[in-house]
A protein has these predicted regions:
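C-terminal peripheral helix-coil segments that are non-catalytic and often amphipathic
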Residues: 1-21, 108-116, 152-153, 157-161, ...
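Short, basic, alpha-helical segments at the C-terminal edge of helix-turn-helix-like DNA-binding modules
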Residues: 82-88
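Amphipathic alpha-helical segments used for helix-helix packing
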Residues: 104-105, 118-142
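Helix-turn-helix
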Residues: 2, 33, 37-75, 79
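Amphipathic alpha-helical packing segments from all-alpha helical-bundle domains
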Residues: 89, 119-122, 138-165, 176, ...
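Short coil/turn segments at alpha/beta junctions that flank glycine-rich nucleotide-binding fingerprints
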Residues: 44-48, 99, 120, 165
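Hydrophobic alpha-helical connector segments
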Residues: 79, 90-123, 174-181, 202-205
Length: 217
């Protein structure tokens, strides 16, 4: 067990916060600062190489300030994962629910993710790199696979609704097409986080939307 993975002995049992505030703590805004910095560094370095000391240095905090909010690196990673899932995946699916058809649902999901990307690219970077970390670290696998399954089921559900509505042919292989679309969407996440600019991402989504509704060619 590394130093970052060990629980903080001074932490109150059953609570993530300790009594009192260490230097440089400032309530929720400090916690969000830690989460964003951790999200950036987990994406850049991977789970294994990222340390509390590096997070504290980049965030302009002390290591005790990080420990004030998070007992261990796994605790912090879980909080970063949950934040990314809420802001990207959950928000995207909520936006898609209001769309009237399959192209609209998939486009709405991607546009919601793009909006988050315009404000903070570290979300796309973390979600993409989290899958890679899940293959290297068994303790991270369940959450990453659950998130992937959630997106997979969203896509499959949209396809089944499209079949029932007569938007696509009835003999469509939902499983195979779902995997294809998940692969495309994961690739867009990689593109958003590490390759293209935000304007380029918007253009990619526009073209993908046209591909879905049959107006690209």
């Amino acid at each position: 067990m590394t130093e970052d993975e060990q629980p903080v002995r001074a932490a109150t049992s059953g609570s993530r916060r300790r009594r009192g505030r260490p230097p440089a703590s400032g309530g929720p805004s400090t916690e969000q600062r830690i989460l964003r910095t951790a999200r950036e560094l987990f994406s850049e370095l991977g789970y294994e190489k990222c340390t509390f000391s590096e997070i504290a240095e980049r965030a302009g905090l002390t290591r005790p300030a990080i420990n004030h909010y998070f007992h261990s690196k796994k605790d912090l990673y879980d909080a970063v994962f949950e934040s990314a899932e809420d802001n990207v995946v959950t928000t995207g699916m909520a936006s898609a629910a209001a769309a009237p058809d399959l192209p609209g649902q998939l486009t709405a999901f991607l546009r919601a993710a793009s909006q988050v990307d315009s404000e903070d690219r570290s979300y796309a970077r973390f979600i993409t790199s989290a899958l890679l970390d899940a293959f290297r670290h068994p303790e991270l696998r369940d959450r990453a696979h659950a998130q992937l399954d959630e997106v997979r089921e969203f896509v499959a559900g949209s396809l089944r609704e499209a079949i029932e509505a007569g938007e696509v042919r009835a003999d469509l292989d939902v499983g195979a097409v779902s995997e294809m679309l998940v692969a495309v969407m994961w690739g867009m996440g990689l593109y958003a986080g590490f390759v293209g600019t935000h304007d380029q991402l918007e253009s990619v989504i526009d073209q993908f939307s046209r591909l879905l509704d049959g107006s690209l060619w």
